[in-house]
Design a protein with these regions (language model features):
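HIT superfamily nucleotide-processing domains
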Residues: 1-129
Length: 129
């Protein structure tokens, strides 16, 4: 185990050193409720292999990990009929808002237009076109 893995918050959750509310788990991934819920049911999916972010992924890592997004999203939707939509968010690197340096995907259920938004939606079409 590397020093990075030893001190990694999500690696500690995978090893059971830190408790979590697990939604889904198998040999490849663990999904659990985010401690800082943007909305009720906000879930994180993490690979059990320590990868900092998508820049570290091989094609095999991506295939192994990303296939579970729809499985977990469908389970979240099935668990709560009030869910009308779902944001799937990934922050790669500190500059992009990544806080825990272990790759993870946010699944944020949406029930109404009044739900808090974690990513600001700004129209920059004039600036970037």
């Amino acid at each position: 185990m590397t020093e990075l893995e030893k001190d990694c918050l999500f690696c500690k959750i995978i090893r059971g050193e830190i408790p979590s509310y697990t939604v889904f788990e198998n040999d490849d991934v663990k999904a659990f409720l985010d401690i800082s819920q943007v909305t009720k049911g906000h879930t994180l999916i993490i690979p059990k292999k320590h990868l900092v972010n998508f820049f570290d992924y091989s094609q095999e890592d991506a295939a192994r990990f990303l296939q579970y997004i729809p499985v977990i999203a469908q389970a979240i939707k099935k668990s709560d009929p009030t869910i009308k939509g779902l944001n799937v968010e990934v922050n790669n690197g500190e500059i992009a808002g990544q806080v825990v340096m272990h790759s993870h995907i946010h699944l944020i259920p949406r029930r109404s237009e009044n739900d808090p938004v974690s990513t600001p939606h700004v129209n920059n079409a004039d600036e970037y076109s």
